[in-house]
Amino acid sequence: MAWRAAASTCAALLILRWALTTAGDLKVEMMAGGTQITPLNDNVTIFCNVFYSQPLNITSMGITWFRKSLTFDKEVKVFEFFGDHQEAFRPGAIVSPWRLKSGDASLQLPGIQLEEAGEYRCEVVVTPLKAQGTVQLRVVASPASRLFLDQVGVKENEGKYMCESSGFYPEAINIIWKKQTLKFPHPIEISEDVITGPTIKNMDGTFNVTSCLKLNSSQEDPGTVYQCVVWHESLHTPLRNNFTLTAARHSLSETEKTDIFSIHWWPISFIGVGLVLLIVLIPWKKMCNKSSSAYTPLKCIMKHWNSFDTQTLKKEHLVFFCTWAWPSYQLQDGEAWPPEGSVNINTIQQLDVFCRQEGKWSEVPYVQAFFALRDNPDLCQCCRIDPALLTVTSGKSIDDNSPKSEKQTPREHSDAVPDAPILPVSPIWESPPATTSITPVLPSQPPTLLLPLQ
């Protein structure tokens, strides 16, 4: 009995070996290096080549593509092909049957998105053999870059140049400033008076960032070329934006300043002493008592940070937007955002509309913080914010054309952006009295551009 069982096992092994030898060798090859990079929204082909020792018969073979995302350690089926059956589990996914005859089992995906990055596995079955291969797919988005001059709130002979990069992925990016003078034609990197803000995530998963260069044209040579250089892994070569400094306004020489001062310093001294006595010393106590505890709107929000529903917003982002980005925006009705913040309903509304029209959805939740501050009189009183700022003092209200806009009422915050938190560098201030918590409501879809007053 034992001899017969051993003989049967030996015969089975010989038959299996003969079948495998007859079937031939099956092998799958993917992208060299194991990683494939593709631009966002491109039509991508993920390569998979099948090598078989015999001619392929697609009616008796199977192809299945799987994807494992970067965030979840679980495979999902993307496409399958067996004989005359094929099914796409991702819209538009396809493997060309006529290319498969020559061993090309590549997967085609139109309009690739960021969330579709991950590990792709190509599994090929030619009965009784099976082979597979994997490749990492990375999706990148190239930044769009622009350079502009911010003329809001700058002094004479000063300039604030903004270099904005938007819509890039992944988050890592490098922005540097260089200058090239007539005397030194080789570009050199600038390290002083450069401020680069935080990277802000957009609703589509891409990122934005702004870098600022401050210049005093009276201290720079006319004809100097300045350059903003943007490096990102999606770019083959860096993006470069240039501007040339024009001739600075004439200012007095040191000799002229010295001559003028030597002639007039006596009367200037007496006048200066008089001004100090009249303007500073006499009302000093009254001024201190009145203004020592007053706060700007931005400072008030920072001070009472825990009174707001901040969610995932960051203080440093609010500071950057309020002091750098928003003052450079050209708002309607002649409004301009002050670096210290605002509780003027016209100014806040126009900034809110501008951010929505320009697709700056990540900034809208930070604007909502000023709406929330304005709609809390107790907090405004606690911060000693000027009551005049709580009324419509300039511009044109968004509801001016409405017959029901005779009376201004507090604004509802039901139009905030999805996934938006409220609010930016924590200075240390004196502890305020306890205040009531403010919780703006955040919807699940992008809001409309009009913000009517109820």
Swiss-Prot record:
Region (Disordered): 395-454
Membrane association type: Single-pass type I membrane protein
Keyword Transmembrane attributed: yes
Gene name of the record: NCR3LG1
Known glycosylation sites: N43, N57, N208, N216, N242
InterPro entries on file: G_retro_matrix_sf, Ig-like_dom, Ig-like_dom_sf, Ig-like_fold, Ig/MHC_CS, Ig_C1-set, Ig_sub, Retroviral_Gag-Pol_poly
Localization per Swiss-Prot or TrEMBL: Cell membrane
Name of this protein: Natural cytotoxicity triggering receptor 3 ligand 1
Subunit structure: Monomer. Interacts specifically with NCR3.
Disulfide bonds: C48-C122, C163-C228
Every Ig-like C1-type domain range: 143-246
Positions with biased composition (Low complexity): 439-454
Annotated transmembrane regions: 263-283
Cytoplasmic compartment segments: 284-454
Signal peptide stretch: 1-23
Cited function: Triggers NCR3-dependent natural killer cell activation.
